[in-house]
């Protein structure tokens, strides 16, 4: 990894620290970059106008004993990757040919959105047990790299 990869991953980690997820280990950040310029950022948290999990002082998934990686729709949070893509859509910013830096490997739902957004490269730091997401990235021809310092 080069100095820019390190800088952008540090930025993704900073953005992830803004997460409103009740579970500290689920603070995820994502930034989308093109030509060394940040286009958008995203962190996982409740949609605008919805009470956050931190404010609720609970994780509904933990409360209902939902295993990690299952029933992803049963959560207040919008994923960091989704928020970065949504922000681009709201601002009219094209992500074609851009690189996404993400603190965690995306889930399959985010993988499909990343592919369709036009992002061409993903650099992630921490793994996530979702082999199908990686299979989709491979089939779509998206370059995926695990960040190593």
Could you say what each language-model-derived stretch is?
Residues 1-149:
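Zinc-dependent deaminase catalytic domain
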